[in-house]
């Protein structure tokens, strides 16, 4: 082994295996592109993105960490979201939650 070398086991890596997911249709009604990062709380994304927000509470994009999805002006697409895990508490972003996700409607 070389110092710093990473040895990966054979096979595929499944991201977010067994986690709750939801698909949502999103349209950018703004005049500028909107980019959403992999771990951004989708419920709180830019208001120029038009979609049914209620089902997205506690969800983020189901994409690899460190990546993003870009919505060009006038563009519509369907994205898959995955539920947050762990303590399921959300702080920051636009400040719409600021605490536990459980018990919210």
UniProtKB/Swiss-Prot annotation:
Pathway: Nitrogen metabolism; urea degradation; CO(2) and NH(3) from urea (urease route): step 1/1
Organism this protein belongs to: Pseudomonas putida (strain ATCC 47054 / DSM 6125 / CFBP 8728 / NCIMB 11950 / KT2440)
Record-linked InterPro entries: Urease_beta-like, Urease_betasu_sf, Urease_subunit
PANTHER family: UREASE
Classification via HAMAP family: Urease_beta
Family: Belongs to the urease beta subunit family.
One GO CC annotation: urease complex
Superkingdom field: Bacteria
Annotated SUPFAM superfamilies: Urease, beta-subunit (SSF51278)
Localization (cell): Cytoplasm
Reactions accelerated catalytically: urea + 2 H2O + H(+) = hydrogencarbonate + 2 NH4(+)
EC number: 3.5.1.5
Protein name (Swiss-Prot/TrEMBL): Urease subunit beta
Top-level enzyme category: hydrolase
Entry GO MF terms: urease activity
């Amino acid at each position: 082994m070389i110092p710093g070398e990473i040895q990966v086991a054979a096979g595929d890596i499944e991201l977010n295996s067994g986690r709750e997911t939801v698909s949502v249709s999103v349209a950018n009604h703004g005049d500028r592109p909107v980019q959403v990062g992999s771990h951004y709380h989708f419920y709180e994304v830019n208001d120029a993105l038009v979609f049914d927000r209620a089902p997205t509470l506690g969800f983020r994009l189901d994409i690899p960490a460190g990546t993003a999805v870009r919505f060009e002006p006038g563009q519509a697409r369907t994205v898959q979201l995955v539920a947050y895990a762990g303590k399921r508490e959300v702080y920051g972003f636009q400040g719409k939650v600021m605490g536990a996700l459980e018990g919210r409607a």
